[in-house]
């Protein structure tokens, strides 16, 4: 019975090897291919199969996804025992010179003879579908972020600019009935003061929406201008450190960094009850990192956010638009540390 089962298993495995759409390759320790099924011939030719050329797999490989990059040859899976114990994504060049993504395994199946089995399953359609879904997801997040921004602008216009304009309108109407010249001059001066304040409010709102210096000069200049204005308006000191100098980044990245830092500072202003805020911007290798730290009230991350909660939500949404992440470390009475990390 055992012998019959063994024969049947051998037959099934052979049929699977011959008819599977999965590409199956057997190679020795030197990378020389000693056998492969028909499916694998989309990538490896008969010459690769029967020649004595070592590392034929390496010749067709365009890198695999690891901690270093999406397509990297560092810590090659042909040599790394850690990688060989897992499934991984690899990019192989087909015979018509197209680079395709595959889910792969590379396993030692005969230790005595040093024979490895290399299997490949094409995941092009799955990745394409994932990218479409990701684009749709990011589009929804973009629209959501835009709507939240519009709501914020609408609130600020209603609470400050429109209220002040209504005040000016009322006072101008009353001037028509003012017969006391001295009182008339006082009212006119008051209106002049309100209008000047309105101009400042609108100018500040314009800077918050999109500072010209961000487009023209980059993050460093935009932050220095914003921090100076912030200190003048609120009396809170900003301690700023940076190593980016005048380095320019992608426009979307600069916008996200500026907005997240701005939102973190405004949250500290509203809730932290502090006299100073530390802001750091640094480029470390292939990452841009921004930190906003205060030693204020802090909060319980598990509790419902104060206010609308759109600030923290918006920071995460913005970061995701450029494949970044926001980490918030805080405790009640121990301050808050907001860290933005963006790959560049």
Curated annotation (Swiss-Prot):
This is Oxygen sensor histidine kinase NreB. Its main location: cytoplasm. Keywords: 4Fe-4S, ATP-binding, Cytoplasm, Iron, Iron-sulfur, Kinase, Metal-binding, Nucleotide-binding, Phosphoprotein, Transferase, Two-component regulatory system. [4Fe-4S] cluster binds at residues 58, 61, 73, 76. The keyword Nucleotide-binding applies. One of its GO terms (molecular function) is iron ion binding. It comes from Staphylococcus aureus (strain Mu3 / ATCC 700698). It catalyses: ATP + protein L-histidine = ADP + protein N-phospho-L-histidine. InterPro entries: HATPase_C_sf, His_kinase_dom, Sensor_HK_TwoCompSys, Sig_transdc_His_kin-like_C, Sig_transdc_His_kin_sub3_dim/P, Sig_transdc_His_kinase_NreB. Member of the two-component regulatory system NreB/NreC involved in the control of dissimilatory nitrate/nitrite reduction in response to oxygen. NreB functions as a direct oxygen sensor histidine kinase which is autophosphorylated, in the absence of oxygen, probably at the conserved histidine residue, and transfers its phosphate group probably to a conserved aspartate residue of NreC. NreB/NreC activates the expression of the nitrate (narGHJI) and nitrite (nir) reductase operons, as well as the putative nitrate transporter gene narT. Binds 1 [4Fe-4S] cluster. Its EC number is 2.7.13.3.
């Amino acid at each position: 019975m055992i012998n019959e089962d063994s024969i049947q298993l051998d037959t099934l495995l052979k049929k699977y090897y011959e008819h599977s759409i999965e590409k199956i390759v057997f190679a020795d320790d030197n990378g020389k291919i000693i056998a492969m099924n028909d499916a694998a011939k989309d990538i490896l030719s008969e010459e690769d199969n029967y020649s004595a050329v070592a590392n034929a797999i390496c010749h067709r490989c365009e890198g695999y996804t690891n901690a270093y990059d999406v397509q990297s040859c560092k810590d090659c899976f042909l040599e790394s025992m850690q990688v060989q114990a897992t499934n991984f994504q690899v990019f192989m060049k087909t015979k018509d010179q197209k680079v395709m993504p595959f889910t792969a395994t590379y396993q030692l199946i005969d230790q005595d003879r040093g024979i490895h089995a290399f299997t490949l399953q094409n995941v092009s359609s799955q990745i394409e579908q994932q990218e479409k879904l990701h684009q749709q997801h990011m589009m929804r997040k973009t629209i959501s972020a835009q709507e939240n921004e519009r709501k914020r602008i609408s609130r600020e216009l209603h609470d400050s600019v429109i209220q002040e304009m209504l005040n000016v309108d009322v006072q101008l109407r009353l001037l028509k009935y003012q017969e006391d010249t001295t009182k008339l001059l006082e009212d006119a001066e008051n209106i002049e003061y309100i209008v000047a304040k309105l101009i400042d409010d609108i100018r500040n709102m314009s800077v918050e929406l999109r500072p010209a210096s961000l487009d023209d000069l980059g993050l460093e200049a935009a932050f220095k201008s914003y921090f100076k204005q912030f200190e003048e308006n609120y009396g809170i000191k900003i301690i700023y450190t940076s190593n980016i100098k005048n380095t320019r980044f992608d426009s979307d990245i600069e916008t996200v960094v500026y907005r997240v830092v701005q939102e973190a500072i405004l949250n500290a202003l509203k809730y932290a009850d502090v006299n100073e805020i530390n802001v750091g911007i640094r480029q470390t290798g292939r990452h841009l990192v921004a930190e906003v730290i205060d030693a204020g009230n802090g909060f319980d991350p598990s509790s419902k956010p104060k206010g609308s909660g759109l600030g923290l939500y918006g920071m995460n949404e913005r970061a995701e638009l450029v494949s970044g992440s926001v980490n918030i470390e805080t405790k009640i009475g121990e301050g808050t540390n907001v860290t933005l990390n963006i790959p560049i």
